[in-house]
Amino acid sequence: MTFSSPLLRFAPSPTGYLHIGNARVALLNALLAQKLGGDFMLRIDDTDTERSKEEYASAIREDLQWLGITWQREEQQSLRFQRYQAALEQLKASGRAYACYDTPEELDLMRKTALGAGRPPIYDRSALRLTTAERAAYEAEGRQPHWRFKLNDSAIDWTDMARGDVHFDAKNLSDPVLYRADGRPLYTITSVVDDGDFSVSHILRGEDHVSNTATQIQLFEALGFAVPEFAHLPLLVGADGKPLSKRWSSDSLKAMCADYEPEALGAFLVALGTSLAAEPVESLETLLESFDIAAYGKASPRFDVDALDALNGRQLQHGDHVRFFLRLAELGIPEEKAADFWAVISGNLGKFSEAKDWWRIINEAPDEIAMTAEDTEFCQAAAALITDAVATKEGYQDWMKQLKKTTGRKGKSLFMPIRHGLTGRSGGPELDRLIALMGVEAAQKRLGRN
């Protein structure tokens, strides 16, 4: 069997909100689908009916759309339980699925015994040696079987789009559980059945799934499906090379929406793991030209928050100003003042949410500012010399020259006390533009009170 056209998928479980690692996987799958000229499918893996919630599924959809990801098809696993059961019956009939009556305690003892003997902790297939009478005795005790897939004792090889040639010896792998004793299907079978039924041609996921892939390849074949191509990418780590902090590994993408621009976050996530520098982009489509799955290395990409903040700040300067103005209105900033305000402060933002702080600084004098007596006296002298002309670049430069001549100050000792006196901060927009925005009279009052 072959695939008529490329189809990729992202398959989140709606047992929680979308986090940064999964968002990256979704982005890369969506981009690869476009690069190959195929379609992208969202599959909601909600077979865990106790923990899955529509609230989470809806939030995942919203987060993907916020990132600019679109999909041409959506499927839901909870609507397909009969299909999974049919696949299990097919495997039973072919002798590739078998019933196991081992309890969790017995399996744990089996694992510890194998490790103690220096053997790999794989299932010993003792269930295959049970007699009919022994099975009947277990069921009389009330034991319900779980079902395993019997692997062929052969080599499992594939050429991974990201890792190159991959080899597993099936005799060193445990026969995977397909169905729990309570009758619930597990990811191993549901994912393969869906990928096979829907003709998913390429599967891109984290390297923690590599061993799953080895067993699933045999399952694809046992069910008569074509085997997709695979790409397994290293998992993200923190800037220090250690596992991501709880904030980034478990917090939802939605929590980041107020701080980061979707284009900046998308460009940053896509560039991670390659030698390419992340740059501000207009949309995800902009990334297609340079996107190449072969460009991703085998080392774990480092998620550097400072680098993301820097890129986000640049995105704010290059992004859609109309969209930013609408968001400024949501912060209570009048429409008629939005353009001038944005022109002055956008270059000093790392996150959009900081715009609200600058609006407050411009319109409300800081409560108390700790300054030396010398700087306080200097600011008062500056207030005495300020004129309406200071709101222009030329007038501001003349004011600085006059202050320099009058006080003997120069460099940082000249302009830093003024910035501090006006804003309470050591950094920010150019002072002439800032004064023009807050008004010369307000600037004079702030400097004169120090």
What are these regions (language model features)?
Residues 1-117, 212-225:
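N-terminal Rossmann-like or analogous alpha/beta NTP/dinucleotide-binding catalytic cores
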Residues 4-9, 285-291, 328-331, 388-409:
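Short amphipathic alpha-helical segments and their helix-coil junctions
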Residues 12-18, 203, 402-408:
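A short glycine/serine-rich beta->alpha loop
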Residues 29, 60, 91, 95, ...:
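Residue-level signal for inorganic ion chemistry
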Residues 99, 103-232, 237-244:
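Active-site cores that bind ATP or allylic diphosphates and position pyrophosphate for catalysis
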Residues 225-368, 423-450:
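Catalytic adenosine-cofactor/nucleotide-binding cores of aminoacyl-tRNA synthetases and other
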Residues 366-395, 399:
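Long, amphipathic alpha-helical coiled-coil segments characteristic
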Residues 390, 394-450:
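Charged substrate- and nucleic-acid-binding regions of tRNA-handling and nucleotidyl-transfer enzymes
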